[in-house]
Amino acid sequence: MADHKLPRKEVAPRPDQTELRVGRLTKAHGLKGAIKLELFTDEPGKRFVPGAVFTLQVPTASKWHGKTLALRELRWYNGHPVGFFDGVDDRTEAESLVKAILWVNQDVRELPDEEDAWYDNQLVGLSAHRDGAVVGAIVRVDHLPGQDLLAIKTPGGEVLVPFVKAIVPEVDLAARTVTLTPPPGLFEDLPDDAPAAGDESEPVSPPVTAEETPGGE
């Protein structure tokens, strides 16, 4: 799984710099501040070296908001990566970091050219097309542990669209458009085909009593 090359929208990197999402802290491990990680990179030996500094994506209410985290050591326990970080010396501190997403600065000139990989600033502002008609525009990209979501502003409000090939089959940076093939109900309410209660056109069968139920006593 390659590094996710979609920096957070709030970060304004230099033209030759971007941020890569490389991991997520998932669970405190032991009593000395160690934390299990979920890796979003094929190169943990390059990204998670002693002294590596990560920008933290955490809620604004977190005491870690706006701070960085420096790695002391990465170990493997039963096939799972576990990180030890400066300033995180007990289980309480480790638990306060659970669900934090780790980002690193990256020189874009060192990134390999890769299809189907875009930066947030390339996607924000693109118009979203469905069946040849414009339905809205991308206003941000939300990065969740399971997948990324495109936040699309429409006349009816904001719609979150899973950024997967089946729903977003085409991104055309030159035309400043994305093509959508959303499932029913994503952009509109599904029709209610169920008959209304008391509708005489759909008679309701009387309730079945215990005596009428096969095997009832």
Curated annotation (Swiss-Prot):
GO CC aspect terms: cytoplasm; ribosome
An example Gene Ontology biological process: rRNA processing
Domain PRC barrel: 115-186
Subcellular location: Cytoplasm
InterPro entries recorded: PRC_barrel-like_sf, PRC_RimM, RimM, RimM_N, RimM_N_sf, Transl_B-barrel_sf
Record SUPFAM superfamilies: PRC-barrel domain, Translation proteins
Sequence segments annotated as region (Disordered): 181-217
GO molecular function ontology, one term from the record: ribosome binding
Keywords: Chaperone, Cytoplasm, Ribosome biogenesis, rRNA processing
Domain statement: The PRC barrel domain binds ribosomal protein uS19.
HAMAP family xrefs: Ribosome_mat_RimM
Function, as annotated: An accessory protein needed during the final step in the assembly of 30S ribosomal subunit, possibly for assembly of the head region. Essential for efficient processing of 16S rRNA. May be needed both before and after RbfA during the maturation of 16S rRNA. It has affinity for free ribosomal 30S subunits but not for 70S ribosomes.
Stated family: Belongs to the RimM family.
Assembly behavior: Binds ribosomal protein uS19.
Name the record gives this protein: Ribosome maturation factor RimM
Organism: Leifsonia xyli subsp. xyli (strain CTCB07)
Taxonomic classification: Bacteria, Bacillati, Actinomycetota, Actinomycetes, Micrococcales
